[in-house]
Amino acid sequence: MESALPSIFTLVIIAEFIIGNLSNGFIVLINCIDWVSKRELSSVDKLLIILAISRIGLIWEILVSWFLALHYLAIFVSGTGLRIMIFSWIVSNHFNLWLATIFSIFYLLKIASFSSPAFLYLKWRVNKVILMILLGTLVFLFLNLIQINMHIKDWLDRYERNTTWNFSMSDFETFSVSVKFTMTMFSLTPFTVAFISFLLLIFSLQKHLQKMQLNYKGHRDPRTKVHTNALKIVISFLLFYASFFLCVLISWISELYQNTVIYMLCETIGVFSPSSHSFLLILGNAKLRQAFLLVAAKVWAKR
């Protein structure tokens, strides 16, 4: 049974890979068609395109690293191939996490209502704020790459000095833990910002509901619905973050106990998260949901 597990997990990852490419490709295609036809696109749709493209890159990177780890381990743990795989994973993962955070900030500034002058200043310039944050995250990416590159150089120096396979594999596990720890530390910042945005949205909704009660207008007003929908989207991003940290935790456990099954489970979760969350984004966006239902209806009619 255990010998069949790699094949089973491979089939699951390939299925998730196909679903992830279809869902994220659908987001890019529909928004690009809308962009060409209307010659303009909202900030949300532009962010969705960037997020979908980065997720496609992440899914491809996970699939390639999966097959390299299973069939070409010597390439995976040494040389230029190692640097390319780790750097591509860092870049795609960076944009995945930070774009999720930027979405949370965008909904906070667009929907929440606070009387603070600083908040109102940011609210009136939301598009510039989002652009500046997106550019500012490149500093974190640059620092992350520098730190990881130091780990890689240190590992390659030790690898070239001692090519004994047992030594290389045990030392590679230490190197892998160092890389994952560094990435986790850099991932805490976007998660913290997204969580604060979520709390502020809840606080804004609570204030709005209290105001509605005082005015005897009830709770079922359009602004309450907008708040609720925004909270659902932000919660979905927080769940995406949770799955990411769960994946990292499981990966650490696999390194600690040298358990291949746990590693394969980690990779499976790593592909499932960006694939499934994109479907939630499609269903939560009116334009994408309508296009998806139209395509689904046409496909069903042809059967």
UniProtKB/Swiss-Prot annotation:
GO MF, one annotated term: G protein-coupled receptor activity
Positions on the Cytoplasmic side per record topology: 29-55, 107-128, 206-232, 283-303
Claim: Aminoacyl-tRNA synthetase is one of the keywords in the record: no
GO CC annotation terms, alphabetical: membrane; plasma membrane
Alphabetical list of InterPro entries matching this protein: TAS2R
Pfam family, one: TAS2R
Key words, A-Z: G-protein coupled receptor, Glycoprotein, Membrane, Receptor, Sensory transduction, Taste, Transducer, Transmembrane, Transmembrane helix
GO BP annotations, alphabetical order: detection of chemical stimulus involved in sensory perception of bitter taste; positive regulation of cytokinesis
Tissue: Expressed in subsets of taste receptor cells of the tongue and palate epithelium and exclusively in gustducin-positive cells.
Record CDD domains: 7tm_TAS2R13 (cd15026)
Positions annotated with a glycan in the UniProt record: 162, 166
Membrane topology category: Multi-pass membrane protein
Location of this chain's protein in the cell: Membrane
Transmembrane segments: 8-28, 56-76, 86-106, 129-149, 185-205, 233-253, 262-282
Note: Most taste cells may be activated by a limited number of bitter compounds; individual taste cells can discriminate among bitter stimuli.
Assigned protein family: Belongs to the G-protein coupled receptor T2R family.
Name listed for the protein in its UniProt record: Taste receptor type 2 member 13
Annotated organism of origin: Homo sapiens (Human)
Gene responsible for this protein: TAS2R13
